[in-house]
Swiss-Prot record:
<comment type="subunit">
    <text>Homodimer. Interacts with ATL1. Interacts with RTN4. Isoform 3 interacts with BACE1, BACE2, BCL2 and FADD. Interacts with ATL2. Interacts with TMEM33. Interacts with ZFYVE27 and with KIF5A in a ZFYVE27-dependent manner. Interacts with RIGI. Interacts with TRIM25.</text>
</comment>
<keyword id="KW-0812">Transmembrane</keyword>
<feature type="topological domain" description="Cytoplasmic">
    <location>
        <begin position="994"/>
        <end position="1032"/>
    </location>
</feature>
<feature type="region of interest" description="Disordered">
    <location>
        <begin position="696"/>
        <end position="726"/>
    </location>
</feature>
<feature type="topological domain" description="Cytoplasmic">
    <location>
        <begin position="888"/>
        <end position="947"/>
    </location>
</feature>
<feature type="modified residue" description="Phosphoserine">
    <location>
        <position position="735"/>
    </location>
</feature>
<feature type="compositionally biased region" description="Basic and acidic residues">
    <location>
        <begin position="696"/>
        <end position="715"/>
    </location>
</feature>
<keyword id="KW-0931">ER-Golgi transport</keyword>
<feature type="modified residue" description="Phosphoserine">
    <location>
        <position position="453"/>
    </location>
</feature>
<keyword id="KW-0945">Host-virus interaction</keyword>
<feature type="domain" description="Reticulon">
    <location>
        <begin position="844"/>
        <end position="1032"/>
    </location>
</feature>
<dbReference type="GO" id="GO:0005783">
    <property type="term" value="C:endoplasmic reticulum"/>
</dbReference>
<feature type="topological domain" description="Cytoplasmic">
    <location>
        <begin position="969"/>
        <end position="972"/>
    </location>
</feature>
<dbReference type="GO" id="GO:0005615">
    <property type="term" value="C:extracellular space"/>
</dbReference>
<feature type="compositionally biased region" description="Polar residues">
    <location>
        <begin position="605"/>
        <end position="617"/>
    </location>
</feature>
<feature type="modified residue" description="Phosphoserine">
    <location>
        <position position="229"/>
    </location>
</feature>
<dbReference type="GO" id="GO:0000139">
    <property type="term" value="C:Golgi membrane"/>
</dbReference>
Length: 1032
C-alpha cells in the first residue's frame, strides 16, 4: 500500500517525469481515479492529478508553523492541517525559487508525461523524503504536493462530473507543504500511504485549484495565484477573514475546507466572472476587445488582496503559529516581485469529446476557445506585456502567460488540417494557421527541423508589432518533453524566476512570409512591444540536441491582393520606416516575401546555422504587415549580460565566426546572390541588395530600385514580382561610427545630384504618396555593403521625412527649394505691398492709369482745383477756404440727419459714427515702416547732393550747373504753381496715352534718340580734347 518506492515516484514535479504507468490503479493522469480506487495509494495519483489537470482552479494556500509539523509527526489529532513554514529568503533563493518552465506536461491518452527541469538541488530535497519512517495511518499525505482543495483518496471532495484531466498548478518554492487529511473514508477501508513523509525540511507551498465539471468545460475560468479564491463561494456560509499580515489563507480543518470547496467547484466558473476572465457567453469580439487585460498582481506595497479573493480563516490554535506565519510572509516579501510575475490569462479551449487525448495544462492557462495573450515579463520592472498568438482553430488569437506555459497539443488543428496525430513525438513540428476563408491552403513543414530536435522557441522582441511564427522549445527541460502532435500551438516563453539558469532568451526564427493565405484570415501573431529583459542574469542559449538550420520553405501560392486587403488586419501600428534595429540574438532568420505576388515555384529559403544575424524587416504597405525586431538582446549585452550559445560561446565569438563566414561569402554580381559558406552551405538568394517595396496602383507591391542610383551595387528591377529581399548582415547598425555617417552624408549629396539628373525618367516609376514612403521599411544590403546599405536606409528615411508637400521623392529637394524661394518672394511682395499701402492709401499706378475712373477723377479734380486756387490766391487763403468748405458739408449733413431722425422719430445715431469708429492711430510699427521707407530716399538724396556739390565727379557737377542755368529761363516764363499744374496734367495724361499708343510712341522715340546720338557724335568729333580721350 504505502510503498517507499511509490513515495519517490512523484518526489518532484520538476525533476522527475511522473512516470505513473497507465496500468497502475492510482497512477492515471486523471485525479478522478484517485477517489474511486481504494486498493492503491492515492499519493502518486494525487501528485499526477496535481500536474496533469487541464482546468483552472481556485487557489488556496495552506500555511502553518513548523511546530505543527513536529506535532503532527508525534501523533497529533489528524484533524489539524499541518503545513510547513516558509524558509528564509536566502534559503529560498538557494533552492532556486523559479517559475518553472518544466511545470508543463502533455497527456498522451491517459498517461501524463512531465518533463523534468533538471535541478540538482531539488534532488537533495527529494532525498530527504526517504529519511522519514513511513507507516500506515488514517491520514492521506502526498509526498511532494498536497492534494488540491483538500481532496483525499477515500472521501472524494471533487464532484463526479469533473473532467478526466483536471488541472492543478504547483509552484515549487523549494519547500514542500504537506496537507495531512484527518480521516480517510476509503470504500475498502484501506488507509493511504505515507502519512508523515517528508514533513521536516522538505517544505513547499502549493497553489491548490478548483475544478470544473464537463458541462462547464468550455467556459473560461478565472485563474488565480496566491490563494486567490472565487469572489463568491456557494454552499455553506464561509467566514472570510484576512490572516494577519499575510496574503495567504489559513484554513482550520480539512472537513470544512472539503465541504466548502465541494460547492465552490460547481460554481467556480460563475463566481469567477467579475474580476477574472470571460465566460463562454461572450462573443469573440468581446474577447478581442478585452484580450489585453492583465489581472492586477499584488506587490509589496499594494496592500491586501480583495476580501472576496481570499478564503481566509483565522488560525485558532496558537498565537505562535500566527506569528510564525507573519514572519514567513514578511520573508516572502523579499522576492514577491518575481513571484508575482505569474500572470493570469485564459487558455485555448479543448474539445470535450477528445478526453482520451486531453492535454494537460497548468492553472495559469485556461482552456477557452477565445483569444489569449502572451505577457512577456520584463523582470526588471515587473511589467507585463501580452502577446496574442494566432489561434489554431481559426477563430481568435491564443494567449499564454509568462509564469507557467503549458504546451497545448491542439486537437482542433488536427481536425482542421485533416492530419492524424503522428506517433513520432519529436518529429518535425509545424505551426499551420488555418483561416476561416474558403481559399485557405494547407501548409507543410513551415518550420522544418531535424528529427529528435524539439522546435526552437521564437521570441519577437519588437517595439513595433510583429507577425511571426512563434515556436516554443522545451530545450531547457533536457529535451525530454514529448509533443503530442505535429501541429502544436507553441508560444514564446519567458522565465520570471530568480534563477539565472532558467532565464532564457531563445533564438528568433521569424517567418513573416509563411503561408500568407493562412495569415490573412487569422488575426496574425501580433507581438506589441514584447521585450524580454533579464536583470543581472546570464542569457543562455538552451541546447537543442543539434544546432540545425531553421528553414523557411515550401511557401505555397499566395492569395490575391483583394483578399489580402479584406482579411489582413492592420497590425503595423503606424510604425515609422526603418524603425527595427538589429537584434544581437543569434540565429535571427527572417525570410520576407511580398504579400501580393510571389511565384510559388521559387520559395525564399533562409538558412543560417550558428550565426548571429541582424534583421531588417520589410513593411508591406498593402497589408500593414510588419516585423519589428528591436535591439533588446543587444542592449542587454551592452549592459554586461552574457549571451551564451550552445557551446557557451560569447557574442564576440559568434560575431567572429560569422565574420569568418562572411569573408568566405561570394557576391555574384550577375545574379546578385549572396552565398554564405558555413557549417551547412547556406544560400541567400537575394534581389539587388537595396530594394524598396512600394504600393502600386493595382494594390500589389512594386519594387522600385532605389539602389539603382548606386550603379555599382544593383540593377533596376521594376514590376510586381519581388525576388528575395532579405539579406543578412553580421554587424548591427548601431556599430556604425562617425566616418560612416560622413560617408552617408556624402552619398546623400551625390544621390541628390543624380536624382535631379534622372528626374524625368524616374518620376514615372517613383509616383508614391508621402504617407506611403513614410510607412515603408527598407532592406539592408548584404554583408559586403553594410555602409552603403546604411547610407541608403538613412537617405530614404530622410527623404520620407522631408516629403512634406511633394509627392515625388526624386525631386523633393529641388521642390523644397523652389517652394522656399517662392514663399520668400511672396512674403517680400506682401511686405512691399503693405509698405505701399501705408505710404499711399491707394495705388499711384492705378490712379495715373485711370484703373478706377471715379477715384482717379476725384483725386485729379481736387488737386487741380487746389493748384489753380494757389495760382490765383495765397496759400493761406486757399487752405482756409478748403477747410470752411469741408466743415460746411459735414455740419450740414449732420444737421440734416438730426432733423430727419427727429421727424421720423428714429434713433439711427450719429451719421458719421462708422467713420468715427475707424482706427486711424498710427502704430509704432507703421511709423517705423514709414520712416524706413523715407530714410532710404533721404539717405540717397543726401549722398547725391554731397557728391554733386563737393564735385566728386566734375562732369556730373557741370551737368547740374547747365540744368540749373536752363531752369532760370523757365522760371522767368512760368510760375511755380503753373509748373505744378502742368506737371499734374502731364502725370494724369501721358501714362494713359502712352499705354494706348505704345508702339507708335516707341517708334518715334527711337528715331529721336538716334538723331540725338548722331548729333552728339558730330559735336564730339569737332572737339579735339574729347576725340583724343576716346582714341586712347
Amino acid at each position: 500500500m504505502a510503498e517507499p518506492s511509490a513515495a519517490t515516484q512523484s518526489h518532484s514535479i520538476s525533476s522527475s517525469s511522473f512516470g505513473a504507468e497507465p496500468s497502475a490503479p492510482g497512477g492515471g493522469g486523471s485525479p478522478g481515479a484517485c477517489p474511486a480506487l481504494g486498493t492503491k495509494s492515492c499519493s502518486s495519483s494525487c501528485a499526477d492529478s496535481f500536474v496533469s489537470s487541464s482546468s483552472s482552479q481556485p487557489v488556496s494556500l495552506f500555511s502553518t508553523s513548523q511546530e505543527g509539523l513536529s506535532s503532527l509527526c508525534s501523533d497529533e489529532p489528524s484533524s489539524e492541517i499541518m503545513t510547513s513554514s516558509f524558509l528564509s529568503s536566502s534559503e529560498i533563493h538557494n533552492t532556486g525559487l523559479t517559475i518553472l518552465h518544466g511545470e508543463k506536461s502533455h497527456v498522451l491518452g491517459s498517461q501524463p508525461i512531465l518533463a523534468k527541469e533538471g535541478k540538482d538541488h531539488l534532488d537533495l530535497l527529494d532525498m530527504k523524503k526517504m529519511e522519514k519512517p513511513q507507516g500506515t495511518s488514517n491520514n492521506v499525505s502526498d509526498s511532494s504536493v498536497s492534494l488540491a482543495a483538500g481532496v483525499h483518496c477515500d472521501r472524494p471532495s471533487i464532484p463526479a462530473s469533473f473532467p478526466e484531466h483536471p488541472a492543478f498548478l504547483s509552484k515549487k518554492i523549494g519547500q514542500v507543504e504537506e496537507q495531512i487529511d484527518k480521516e480517510t473514508k476509503n470504500p475498502n477501508g484501506v488507509s493511504s500511504r505515507e502519512a508523515k513523509t517528508a514533513l521536516d525540511a522538505d517544505d513547499r507551498f502549493t497553489l491548490l485549484t478548483a475544478q470544473k465539471p464537463p458541462t462547464e468545460y468550455s467556459k473560461v475560468e478565472g485563474i488565480y495565484t496566491y490563494s486567490l479564491s472565487p469572489s463568491k463561494v456557494s454552499g455553506d456560509d464561509v467566514i472570510e477573514k484576512d490572516s494577519p499580515e499575510s496574503p495567504f489563507e489559513v484554513i482550520i480543518d480539512k472537513a470544512a475546507f472539503d465541504k466548502e470547496f465541494k460547492d465552490s467547484y460547481k460554481e467556480s466558473t460563475d463566481d469567477f466572472g467579475s474580476w477574472s476572465v470571460h465566460t463562454d457567453k461572450e462573443s469573440s469580439e468581446d474577447i478581442s476587445e478585452t484580450n489585453d487585460k492583465l489581472f492586477p498582481l499584488r506587490n509589496k506595497e499594494a496592500g491586501r488582496y480583495p476580501m472576496s479573493a481570499l478564503l481566509s480563516r483565522q488560525f485558532s490554535h496558537t498565537n505562535a503559529a500566527l506569528e510564525e506565519v507573519s514572519r514567513c510572509v514578511n520573508d516572502m516579501h523579499n522576492f514577491t516581485n518575481e513571484i508575482l510575475t505569474w500572470d493570469l490569462v485564459p487558455q485555448v479551449k479543448q474539445q470535450t469529446d477528445k478526453s482520451s487525448d486531453c492535454i494537460t495544462k497548468t492553472t495559469g492557462l485556461d482552456m477557452s476557445e477565445y483569444n489569449s495573450e502572451i505577457p512577456v515579463v520584463n523582470l526588471k520592472t515587473s511589467t507585463h506585456q501580452k502577446t496574442p498568438v494566432c489561434s489554431i482553430d481559426g477563430s481568435t488569437p491564443i494567449t499564454k502567460s509568462t509564469g507557467d506555459w503549458a504546451e497545448a497539443s491542439l486537437q482542433q488543428e488536427n481536425a482542421i488540417t485533416g492530419k492524424p496525430v503522428p506517433d513520432s513525438l519529436n518529429s518535425t513540428k509545424e505551426f499551420s494557421i488555418k483561416g476561416v476563408q474558403g481559399n485557405m491552403q494547407k501548409q507543410d513543414d513551415t518550420l522544418a527541423e531535424l528529427p529528435g530536435s524539439p522546435p526552437e522557441k521564437c521570441d519577437s522582441l519588437g517595439s513595433g508589432v510583429a507577425t511571426v511564427k512563434v515556436v516554443l522549445p522545451d530545450d531547457h527541460l533536457k529535451d525530454e518533453m514529448d509533443w503530442q502532435s505535429s501541429a502544436l500551438g507553441e508560444i514564446t516563453e519567458a522565465d520570471s524566476s530568480g534563477e539565472s539558469d532558467d532565464t532564457v532568451i531563445e533564438d528568433i526564427t521569424a517567418d513573416t512570409s509563411f503561408e500568407n493565405n493562412k495569415i490573412q484570415a487569422e488575426k496574425p501573431v501580433s507581438i506589441p512591444s514584447a521585450v524580454v529583459k533579464t536583470g543581472e542574469r546570464e542569457i543562455k542559449e538552451i541546447p537543442s540536441c543539434e544546432r540545425e538550420e531553421k528553414t523557411s520553405k515550401n511557401f505555397e501560392e499566395l492569395v490575391s491582393d483583394s483578399e489580402l486587403h479584406q482579411d489582413q488586419p492592420d497590425i503595423l501600428g503606424r510604425s515609422p520606416a526603418s524603425e527595427a534595429a538589429c537584434s544581437k540574438v543569434p540565429d535571427t532568420n527572417v525570410s520576407l516575401e511580398d504579400v501580393s505576388e510571389v511565384a510559388p515555384e521559387k520559395p525564399i529559403t533562409t538558412e543560417n546555422p550558428k550565426l548571429p544575424s541582424t534583421v531588417s524587416p520589410n513593411v508591406f504597405n498593402e497589408t500593414e504587415f510588419s516585423l519589428n525586431v528591436t535591439t533588446s538582446a543587444y542592449l542587454e549585452s551592452l549592459h554586461g549580460k552574457n549571451v551564451k550559445h550552445i557551446d557557451d560561446s560569447s557574442p564576440e565569438d559568434l560575431i567572429a565566426a560569422f565574420t569568418e563566414t562572411r569573408d568566405k561569402g561570394i557576391v555574384d554580381s550577375e545574379r546578385n546572390a549572396f552565398k554564405a559558406i558555413s557549417e551547412k552551405m547556406t544560400d541567400f538568394k537575394t534581389t539587388p541588395p537595396v530594394e524598396v517595396l512600394h504600393e502600386n496602383e493595382s494594390g500589389g507591391s512594386e519594387i522600385k530600385d532605389i539602389g539603382s542610383k548606386y550603379s555599382e551595387q544593383s540593377k533596376e528591377t521594376n514590376g510586381s514580382e519581388p525576388l528575395g529581399v532579405f539579406p543578412t548582415q553580421g554587424t548591427p547598425v548601431a556599430s556604425l561610427d562617425l566616418e560612416q555617417e560622413q560617408l552617408t552624408i556624402k552619398a546623400l549629396k551625390e544621390l541628390g545630384e543624380r536624382q535631379v539628373e534622372k528626374s524625368t525618367s524616374a518620376q514615372r516609376d517613383a509616383e508614391l504618396p508621402s504617407e506611403e514612403v513614410l510607412k515603408q521599411t527598407f532592406t539592408f544590403a548584404p554583408e559586403s555593403w553594410p555602409q552603403r546599405s546604411y547610407d541608403i536606409l538613412e537617405r530614404n528615411v530622410k527623404n520620407g521625412s522631408d516629403l512634406g508637400i511633394s509627392q515625388k521623392p526624386i525631386t523633393i529637394r529641388e521642390t523644397t527649394r523652389v517652394d522656399a524661394v517662392s514663399s520668400l518672394s511672396k512674403t517680400e511682395l506682401v511686405k512691399k505691398h503693405v509698405l505701399a499701402r501705408l505710404l499711399t492709401d491707394f495705388s499711384v499706378h492705378d490712379l495715373i492709369f485711370w484703373r478706377d475712373v471715379k477715384k482717379t477723377g476725384f483725386v485729379f479734380g481736387t488737386t487741380l482745383i487746389m493748384l489753380l486756387s494757389l495760382a490765383a490766391f495765397s496759400v493761406i487763403s486757399v487752405v482756409s477756404y478748403l477747410i470752411l468748405a469741408l466743415l460746411s458739408v459735414t455740419i450740414s449733413f449732420r444737421i440734416y440727419k438730426s432733423v430727419i431722425q427727429a421727424v421720423q422719430k428714429s434713433e439711427e445715431g450719429h451719421p458719421f459714427k462708422a467713420y468715427l469708429d475707424v482706427d486711424i492711430t498710427l502704430s509704432s510699427e507703421a511709423f517705423h515702416n514709414y520712416m524706413n521707407a523715407a530714410m532710404v530716399h533721404i539717405n540717397r538724396a543726401l549722398k547725391l547732393i554731397i557728391r554733386l556739390f563737393l564735385v566728386e565727379d566734375l562732369v556730373d557737377s557741370l551737368k547740374l550747373a547747365v540744368f540749373m542755368w536752363l531752369m532760370t529761363y523757365v522760371g522767368a516764363v512760368f510760375n511755380g504753381i503753373t509748373l505744378l499744374i502742368l506737371a499734374e496734367l502731364l502725370i494724369f495724361s501721358v501714362p494713359i496715352v502712352y499705354e494706348k499708343y505704345k508702339t507708335q510712341i516707341d517708334h518715334y522715340v527711337g528715331i529721336a534718340r538716334d538723331q540725338t546720338k548722331s548729333i552728339v557724335e558730330k559735336i564730339q568729333a569737332k572737339l579735339p580734347g574729347i576725340a583724343k580721350k576716346k582714341a586712347e
